[in-house]
Amino acid sequence: MTPAAALTPTTRATFLRKHLWIPLAVALPLLFLLEVTNVDRVVSGWFFDAATGRFPLRYNATFEIVTHHWAKYVVVLIAGVVIGAWLMSFFLPMLRPVRRVLFFLGLALALAPGVVSVLKSQSHRSCPYDLVEYGGNAPHISLFEAAPPGDYPGRCFPSGHASAGFCLFAFYFAGLALRRRWMAMAGLWGGFAAGMLFGLARIAQGAHFLSHNLWSGLVCWLVVLAIYVVIFRPEAGPPAAPKANRAPG
């Protein structure tokens, strides 16, 4: 298959089934179950000390410095390198063939966490450590409930910190565009692992529930997917690349 024919109507339908409909069919029922069961509280309870009424790791220096700050800086550094490479592609002939991929990566790495941040800023759901059951003063509000009257912290859903890891899903789609299976798999599993690791650290600190992190992952996936579809539209086709190590897509 030539690059220009890489997304015919048939393969486009297959692509959307694989990257949109199947992920939604798996993620939405799982997220619904988390919403109507006690799993979130059980997981957060592992890190909550009922005797002191707090999350012992909330202000832990190692967690704050390494997993809360440094981890995000690594992702910001990656985004900075990508944007720098995209700018250099206007001057270095060797980078011109991947200019569109670099543009996609820079945009996806910025917009995926950005969308999560906007959603979080508008949310009425509070962090676990602000909830009454964990020593705070805010009520637990389900996804399907309206905000109750009163001045509560809110702005804690979905997880912004986890999105710094999940945005690395962009490298999965870059691997598809370049037909580099190793890059696609590294982006898929690396992004998932980073998002879950960043998210787990914040669960341990009482800052998020498990469902907050998984919602963040789904939002990042959908944002990155949308950007990929817009930039690598069917009529243009993905950039030319050797057929070896072609990623499925």
Task: Say what each PLM segment does.
Residues 2-82, 120-128, 138:
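N-terminal transmembrane-helix/juxtamembrane module of multi-pass inner/ER membrane proteins
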Residues 6-8, 37, 83-94, 172-179, ...:
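Structural signal for the C-terminal ends of transmembrane alpha-helices
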Residues 10-20, 88-102, 177-188:
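Membrane-interface helix-loop-helix junctions at transmembrane boundaries of multi-pass membrane enzymes
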Residues 17-18, 141-249:
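Membrane-embedded catalytic cores of phosphoryl/pyrophosphoryl-handling enzymes
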Residues 29-33, 110-115, 192-203:
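Aromatic-anchored segments of alpha-helical transmembrane domains
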Residues 42, 97-181:
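Membrane-interface loops
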Residues 87, 91-95, 122-127, 131, ...:
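Membrane-interfacial segments
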